[in-house]
Structure formats: structure tokens, C-alpha cells
A protein has these predicted regions:
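N-terminal secretory signal peptides
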Residues: 1-10, 17-30
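Extracytoplasmic small-molecule ligand-binding "clamshell" domains
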Residues: 20, 39-113
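Extended ligand-binding regions for polar small-molecule ligands
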Residues: 33, 74-83, 144, 152, ...
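Bilobed "Venus flytrap"/periplasmic-binding protein-like clamshell domains
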Residues: 51-52, 56-59, 69-84, 135-193, ...
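Acidic, polar ligand-binding/catalytic clefts
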Residues: 78, 89-153
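A ligand-binding cleft/hinge motif common to bilobed small-molecule-binding domains
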Residues: 115-123, 172-175, 202-238
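Periplasmic-binding protein-like
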Residues: 133-137, 219-258, 281-297
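Ligand-binding clefts/hinges and TM-proximal coupling segments of bilobed small-molecule sensing domains
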Residues: 168-183, 223, 256-297
Length: 297
């Protein structure tokens, strides 16, 4: 890991602190709010502009080295909104745990951050149809000397594990019997990588997509990613699927978005869009994975 690599990523974190990055065009600061009344979809069509929120988590939604927003979710959102006649997508960077509160406060209109669909989140906002599904994995030292391959191994061997703030993995870990004092909550993927590399924790839990991307972008660091798996809760595998998030009152926007998202999924265009970010055909949600089921789980 070179000092220059860390410096570039520190730029991403500083961008997040200021709250706005570009999606092909200059963006408004996150302090600026969206239309306070009326139909959000019609307002977006009239202005040809929609505002999205991201959390700067690669490869789901992040700023590249030039400050342009990209990633799986922003690129899918861009394709959907283009089909709806909305040409410009403006992005605000918000800490992950503040995305839904900022959405509710109308700082932007859609969360495009690959957010996992959970029962708790569904009480606060409305999710699109599942955009993708992903397995969970662990970032471990090269060679995985402790042979930690699943969350239950973390519990059994009492190793320390890192998770991202407000991410679902902490719940998966505690559900697998991992004690709170084994879990270290961190604010960025880079800090997760550092913690494993430096030996402050043995492993880090996140989606296999995120961890593979992290390793790919940091060659030379002595870490590896375990095979992906579904976490187990109450003896049953937990399906992890993410989607886009809307305010509960924005049904017309959500419904129109879902219709175009389905077209992308069905046509194969979605796979083309997301392949550069480590996603593929296997990440298309199965037909029985629905928002209704995920919100009730």
C-alpha cells in the first residue's frame, strides 16, 4: 500500500465531509433541499434533474479520483432516469446512517447507495424492487491462518471483527453468536482494510462484492476474501438484497422507477451496466426475492 493510494482515498472522505460530488455535472450542496411540495416525478421531468444520495462506499456509489460520482447504483439510476426523461443526476455524499434521514428531510429524492432492504429501514422509507442480491464474505489475512470462513467461526474462535457503521453485518454477527466486545465498528472501507492488514482485527465482514473490489483496488496488501455465503438467522439463510430508497409519499416516482428497473433486469442491460463494478448475472435477484418479503423478514 503506497502513501499515495491512501491519500487519494482520503480525498474521497474529505469530499464526503463537504457533502456534494458531481455526477457528470456540478452538483448542489446537500444543504440545498428538493422541491418542498408537489409530485417529485413530475418535478424531475420538468427540470430534467433528479437528486440522489450516496454514501461513498465502493463499488455501490462513490466518487472517483476526479470527483465524479459513479458505481453500481448511480449508473443504474442514471439509466433508469434517462428512460424516464430525466437527463441530469446530481449527487450528495452523506454518511451511510444519515441517508434515510436526509432523504426524509428532502435533501435529495432517491438514495442510490446499494442499501440493503431490511424490516427496520422499511418502516422509515419505501424501497424499490430489489436491484441486486449479494453474498456476505470476510476479509482475512493472506492464507487465512485461523481458517475463519463463516460468521459462526468468528464466534467460536473469538477473533475480533470489523464492520461498517450502520451496516447489516453487525446484526448478522450477533445473530451468529459473536459477542459485542469482539466487534469493532469503523466508518470506512479503507479503515477496515487497514485494521485487518495491521492486525487490529482478524477479519472484516461486508458483501463479497465490496471486499473483492477493495482487494482489487489495493494490490500488494496481504489480505484475501473468503468465499461468499448467506448468513444464517434462526436456522435459516438470510438473503441480502439491496435497492433504491424513496420517501413513502413518492409512490409515483417509485413505481415509475421500478418499471424501468425491471426492463433493465429483463433485457440484460443491467448486467452490462454493473459489470465494471464487480457485479454479474449471479447478482440479479431471484423471482422470489421481493421487497415485500424482505421488509417483513
Amino acid at each position: 500500500m503506497t502513501h499515495g493510494e491512501w491519500t487519494r482515498r482520503d480525498f474521497f472522505r474529505r469530499s464526503a465531509a463537504f457533502g456534494a460530488v458531481a455526477v457528470g455535472v456540478p452538483t448542489l450542496l446537500s444543504a440545498c433541499t428538493t422541491t418542498s411540495s408537489g409530485d417529485t416525478l413530475q418535478a424531475a421531468k420538468s427540470s430534467k434533474t433528479i437528486k440522489i444520495g450516496i454514501a461513498n462506499e465502493a463499488p455501490y456509489g462513490f466518487a472517483d479520483s476526479s470527483g465524479i460520482t459513479t458505481g453500481e447504483a448511480p449508473e443504474v439510476a442514471r439509466a433508469v432516469f434517462k428512460a424516464l426523461g430525466v437527463d441530469q443526476v446530481q449527487a450528495s455524499v452523506v454518511p451511510f446512517d444519515q441517508l434515510i434521514p436526509a432523504l426524509t428531510a428532502k435533501q435529495f429524492d432517491v438514495v442510490a447507495a446499494g442499501m440493503n432492504i431490511t424490516k427496520k429501514r422499511c418502516t422509515a422509507a419505501a424501497f424499490s424492487a430489489p436491484d441486486y442480491s449479494a453474498l456476505t464474505a470476510l476479509l482475512v489475512p493472506k492464507g487465512n491462518p485461523q481458517q475463519i470462513l463463516k460468521l459462526e467461526d468468528v464466534a467460536a474462535k473469538k477473533v475480533k471483527v470489523a464492520v461498517l457503521s450502520a451496516a447489516v453485518e453487525k446484526g448478522y454477527l450477533t445473530g451468529a453468536g459473536v459477542s459485542e466486545n469482539q466487534i469493532q465498528t469503523l466508518d470506512t472501507q479503507d479503515n477496515m482494510l487497514r485494521s485487518v492488514s495491521d492486525g487490529r482485527v482478524y477479519c472484516a465482514a461486508l458483501t463479497d462484492i465490496s471486499l473483492k473490489w477493495l482487494v482489487q483496488k489495493n494490490p500488494g496488501v496481504a489480505v484475501e476474501v473468503t468465499p461468499g455465503f448467506d448468513p444464517v438467522e434462526n436456522g435459516q439463510p438470510v438473503v441480502s438484497a439491496g435497492g433504491f430508497v424513496f420517501r413513502k409519499e413518492d409512490n409515483s416516482l417509485k413505481d415509475a422507477f421500478n418499471a424501468e428497473l425491471k426492463k433493465l433486469h429483463d433485457s440484460g442491460e443491467w448486467v452490462r451496466i454493473v459489470t465494471p463494478f464487480g457485479f454479474g448475472q449471479s447478482n440479479l435477484p431471484k423471482a422470489d426475492v421481493t421487497t415485500e418479503k424482505l421488509c417483513a423478514a
